[in-house]
Each structure stands twice: as C-alpha cells, then as structure tokens.
Amino acid sequence: MALSTRIQAACLLLLLLASVASVSVLPHQTGQLTDLRAQDTAGAEAGLQPTLQLRRLRRRDTHFPICIFCCGCCKTPKCGLCCKT
C-alpha cells in the first residue's frame, strides 16, 4: 500500500513539474510567434516581387515530383510521375 502511494506521489510531482515547465516556456514561444506574424504582415504589405514568388513555387515543386493527377503519359501506367509537367 505504501509503495503505490509513493508511486502516485512521484507521478503527481512529475506532472506538477511538467506543468510548471510548460508554463515557463509558453510565453517565450508566444513571443516568437508574434514576431513571425509581424514579419509576415510586413512582407505582405510591402508586396513581394513576382520573381520571388516564382522561386518559391519552383522550389516547392521540385520537392514533390509526384503528379497527383497522373494522365498516363508514361510507359508504365499509374506510376505517379507525369512526363508532361
């Protein structure tokens, strides 16, 4: 009986320590999010150049070469890669 009480007390202590640690980290992370949000709105207000937008699109497209809507243009059907794009 005493062992289970000790285990319960240890678990409660760990939960309390975890909650204190998460409360101390939360304001720091919230501050980082507000900084990022301010940078995003400043970039949107300034207006991005079209070349920067195209570079972002190209960079994203190169990471995902799989075609979602495969048109069957390859020799192997349903391979997932589109030869025309």
UniProtKB/Swiss-Prot annotation:
- What compartments host this protein? Secreted
Q: Which residues form the signal peptide?
A: 1-22
One GO biological process term is: intracellular iron ion homeostasis
Disulfide bonds, which pairs? Answer: 67-83, 70-73, 71-79, 74-82
Q: Origin, by domain of life?
A: Eukaryota
InterPro entries on file: Hepcidin (IPR010500)
Question: Is-annotated flag, keyword Signal?
Answer: yes
Its predominant location is secreted
Question: Would the keyword Signal turn up in this protein's UniProt record?
Answer: yes
- Among the entry's GO cellular component annotations, what is one? extracellular space
Q: Which residues form the propeptide?
A: 23-54
Instruction: Keywords in alphabetical order, please.
Output: Antibiotic, Antimicrobial, Cleavage on pair of basic residues, Disulfide bond, Hormone, Secreted, Signal
State the Gene Ontology terms under molecular function.
hormone activity
Q: What does this protein do?
A: Liver-produced hormone that constitutes the main circulating regulator of iron absorption and distribution across tissues. Acts by promoting endocytosis and degradation of ferroportin/SLC40A1, leading to the retention of iron in iron-exporting cells and decreased flow of iron into plasma. Controls the major flows of iron into plasma: absorption of dietary iron in the intestine, recycling of iron by macrophages, which phagocytose old erythrocytes and other cells, and mobilization of stored iron from hepatocytes.
Subunit info?
Answer: Interacts with SLC40A1; this interaction promotes SLC40A1 rapid ubiquitination.
User: What protein family is recorded?
Assistant: Belongs to the hepcidin family.
Mind telling me what this protein is named?
A: Hepcidin
